Amino acid sequence: MHAVTRPTLREAVARLAPGTGLRDGLERILRGRTGALIVLGHDENVEAICDGGFSLDVRYAATRLRELCKMDGAVVLSTDGSRIVRANVQLVPDPSIPTDESGTRHRSAERAAIQTGYPVISVSHSMNIVTVYVRGERHVLTDSATILSRANQAIATLERYKTRLDEVSRQLSRAEIEDFVTLRDVMTVVQRLELVRRIGLVIDYDVVELGTDGRQLRLQLDELLGGNDTARELIVRDYHANPEPPSTGQINATLDELDALSDGDLLDFTALAKVFGYPTTTEAQDSALSPRGYRAMAGIPRLQFAHADLLVRAFGTLQGLLAASAGDLQSVDGIGAMWARHVRDGLSQLAESTISDQ
């Protein structure tokens, strides 16, 4: 076996989505009630496990794939899937590679996928299902109607999560303006941002598997998730326990730690607080915090991050920025009179609109 870069399961599923030539070929095979074994890639590693059959090297077509799969052997496609390289070959992967599959075709498919690193598809004629194996992972293709039903339910859940996220975000913004933020307020928003991100990933996988059938779902998902990644980054910039504004490396490390939390830990505010560098006691949740101001200034139109960063480093906190006059802001090296007035007006409008939303 060779440690080389190969397609991920997600990439393989995308190649088999409705609207693709491969999916058309698989649908024809299923309708014909015949089995199939298809290798999605060709190199010396694949050649090493191929026995018998014949070489073709012809342009891929769904009808050709269907006809060639009527024979007992496997079909090998080029790495980009544009050509059919070999047909009716017997795959003889290393029998010592462990597999949990029971059927001969599925066992060969899983072992071949692990040994070569290329996706291998097994079509069961008895169960009428398509399974794709990629480097020790397996995925059973599902019909679009079933996926759409599941994804629409997930979208409804995402909409509820997003509504709740918007509510707690507004509450945090009001607390920031009034200088009454607690660690619990911040962790509530962090939790909701992460919940939205996670269910979004689940739906995104369904969208990938749906292919052309998932276009409308993609539009809905993009609209609901718009700005979520930026919001996660901004809240880390504002509230990381580091005495100085966190570096890009610290921000990425914090977000990675959040991503790695279990669903159970995500419900525990003390676990979230630990990721941000705060004490993990329940009492600490009521401790007062002061935002740096990145999140608030992100709401000022046309304000570049470089300018916001200069101001945060000069004034330290959002309250310091709110108390500063245009002249104070202009005194910061790199902030001209025009930007100083723009920021001063933007912060004033932000404070007024936030309070009026109560």
From Swiss-Prot:
EC nos: 2.7.7.85
Gene3D superfamilies: 5' to 3' exonuclease, C-terminal subdomain, DNA integrity scanning linker region, DNA integrity scanning protein, DisA, N-terminal domain
Signal peptide: none
Enzyme class: transferase
GO molecular-function terms, A-Z: adenylate cyclase activity; ATP binding; diadenylate cyclase activity; DNA binding
SUPFAM superfamilies: RuvA domain 2-like, YojJ-like
The keyword Nuclease is assigned to this record: no
GO biological process terms, semicolon-separated: DNA repair
Reactions catalysed according to its record: 2 ATP = 3',3'-c-di-AMP + 2 diphosphate
Key words, A-Z: ATP-binding, DNA damage, DNA repair, DNA-binding, Magnesium, Nucleotide-binding, Nucleotidyltransferase, Transferase
Span of domain DAC: 6-144
Cofactor(s) required, per the database record: Mg(2+)
A Pfam match: DisA-linker
Positions of ATP binding: G73, L91, T104, R105, H106, R107, S108
Family, as annotated: Belongs to the DisA family.
Subunit note: Homooctamer.
Function: Participates in a DNA-damage check-point. DisA forms globular foci that rapidly scan along the chromosomes searching for lesions.
Protein name per its UniProtKB record: DNA integrity scanning protein DisA
